[in-house]
């Protein structure tokens, strides 16, 4: 039995991500194998249900290969834990497990990420935000790999590097991590981290003081420029012009530029086409919301930092219902702790439901692209299948464009993701639809009314 489990675990460790293996396979315990039946114990109901649906077939296949006979795999709750369900025992078990959570499962909230003190002689890099402290999972592994490559070869790999995604997903952490590594490798490099709003203010100040020569001299002399939330440049033509000059100067000198945004470059409203084409000349990488395993690890580790312990059941309950970003998880944890302490109650699923009832009700109403497609199809009396088809008559094409527009406005999906959900269409098709419907809405009261009705229907 021991030999089988070692072989099975080794195989699964190769096939899964470290987060998946640590969260789902490592906690399992093989109980016995008799008459072609293999019994495996899970530490709680959440892990039991998830492993049965996600990994049962693979474990069954490995077992059949090992014993060379058909094998039935049964998953059960760990008998030892079932027999010892006292709260004190639970706290001890969770505390022990929390120590096994990797130390990099939390994304610290930078204390100076939006500090706008005008001190240009400092890099403004947050030393707490490093690659070691970064949360790693499937959602951000490509962005992290690109960031490490840039940190190791600034100015020669992926220039510019453009990271985009929703708030609280780790973009700011990654660009600070790059800055920290570059500084560690060469303390003499000239680095500047700046939020886009502060850059705009610097442009305004230079204009008021007639100091554009000093402004250009400073920004053009940097070795590494880190611009956060560049979508704030939208509609600000003078700021974009100055940034274009800085961009050209730095790229020509083989200096590194790293940019973050909450949206895909071509989706940034009011951005000069020249800049968008420059952004596209480097590497553009999406940072996605964290997957379930990462969210659980974040909650457990953060709870330990707060001096409390979560049962696995509670952590999985919260992680399954809150899916958007790390900051949302941290905010939810603070609400749970405050509610628990105020009412003098232990943290249970029922307490979590009470503490987060407003947040959970919003999550339960979360809008999906599939729901948008069905609602729009019903509204215009067409088939849902028409949303994915290649048909192009006006009575189908326009509802499809409206559905794409609503998907962009009401969900966190990127343009490529929306295109994939509309029959594998290219992201440029989605972008055209979004811009067209947005323009029509501004000009046509009838279009605006239709969209308003659809939005209210979807939001309930």
From Swiss-Prot:
Annotated GO CC locations: cytoplasm; plasma membrane
GO molecular function terms listed in the Swiss-Prot or TrEMBL record: ATP binding; ATP hydrolysis activity; DNA replication origin binding; lipid binding
Region (Domain IV, binds dsDNA): 341-460
Major subcellular location class: cytoplasm
Cleavable signal peptide: none
Domain of life: Bacteria
One Pfam match: DnaA_N
GO biological process: DNA replication initiation; regulation of DNA replication
Gene3D superfamilies cross-referenced by the UniProt entry: 1.10.1750.10, 1.10.8.60, 3.30.300.180, P-loop containing nucleotide triphosphate hydrolases (3.40.50.300)
Residue numbers spanned by region Domain I, interacts with DnaA modulators: 1-78
Region span, Domain III, AAA+ region: 124-340
Compartment list: Cytoplasm
Comment, domains: Domain I is involved in oligomerization and binding regulators, domain II is flexibile and of varying length in different bacteria, domain III forms the AAA+ region, while domain IV binds dsDNA.
Protein name as annotated: Chromosomal replication initiator protein DnaA
Organism the protein comes from: Herminiimonas arsenicoxydans
């Amino acid at each position: 039995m021991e030999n089988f489990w070692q072989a099975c675990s080794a195989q699964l460790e190769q096939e899964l991500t470290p987060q998946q293996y640590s969260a789902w396979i490592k906690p399992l315990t093989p109980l016995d194998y008799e008459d072609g039946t293999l019994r495996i114990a899970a530490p709680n109901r959440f892990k039991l249900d998830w492993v049965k649906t996600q990994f049962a077939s693979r474990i069954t296949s490995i077992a059949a290969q090992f014993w060379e006979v058909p094998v039935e795999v049964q998953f059960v709750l760990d008998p030892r834990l079932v027999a010892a369900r006292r709260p004190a025992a639970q706290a001890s078990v969770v505390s022990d497990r929390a120590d096994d959570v990797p130390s990099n499962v939390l994304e610290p909230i930078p204390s100076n990420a939006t500090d706008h003190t005008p001190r240009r002689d400092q890099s403004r890099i947050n030393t707490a935000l490093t690659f070691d402290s970064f949360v790693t999972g499937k959602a951000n592994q490509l962005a992290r790999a690109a960031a490490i490559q840039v940190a190791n070869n600034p100015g020669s790999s992926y220039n510019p590097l453009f990271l985009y995604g929703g708030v609280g997903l780790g973009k700011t952490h990654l660009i600070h991590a790059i800055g920290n590594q570059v500084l560690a490798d060469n303390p003499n490099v000239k680095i500047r981290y700046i939020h886009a709003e502060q850059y705009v203010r610097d442009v305004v100040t230079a204009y008021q003081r007639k100091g554009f020569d000093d402004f250009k001299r400073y920004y053009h002399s940097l070795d590494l420029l880190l611009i956060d939330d560049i979508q704030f440049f939208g509609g600000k033509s003078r700021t974009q012009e100055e940034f274009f000059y800085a961009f050209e100067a730095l790229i020509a000198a083989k200096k590194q530029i790293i940019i973050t945004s909450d949206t895909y470059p071509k989706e940034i409203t009011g951005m000069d086409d020249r800049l968008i084409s420059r952004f596209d000349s480097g590497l553009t990488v999406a940072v996605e919301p964290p997957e379930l395993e990462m969210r659980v690890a974040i909650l457990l580790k953060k709870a330990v930092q707060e001096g409390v312990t979560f049962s696995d059941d509670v952590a999985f309950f919260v992680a399954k219902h809150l899916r958007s970003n790390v900051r949302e998880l941290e905010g939810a944890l603070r609400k749970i702790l405050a509610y628990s302490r105020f009412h003098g109650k232990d943290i249970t699923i029922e307490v979590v439901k009470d503490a987060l009832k407003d947040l959970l009700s919003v999550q339960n109403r979360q809008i999906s692209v599939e729901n948008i497609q069905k609602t729009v199809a019903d509204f215009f009396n067409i088939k849902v299948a028409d949303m994915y088809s290649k048909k192009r008559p006006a009575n189908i094409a326009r509802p499809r464009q409206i559905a794409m527009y609503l998907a962009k406005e009401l969900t966190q999906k990127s343009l490529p993701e929306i295109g994939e959900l509309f029959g594998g269409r290219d992201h440029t098709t989605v972008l055209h639809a979004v811009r067209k419907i947005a323009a029509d809405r501004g000009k046509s009261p009838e279009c605006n009314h239709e969209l308003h009705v659809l939005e209210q229907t979807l939001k309930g």
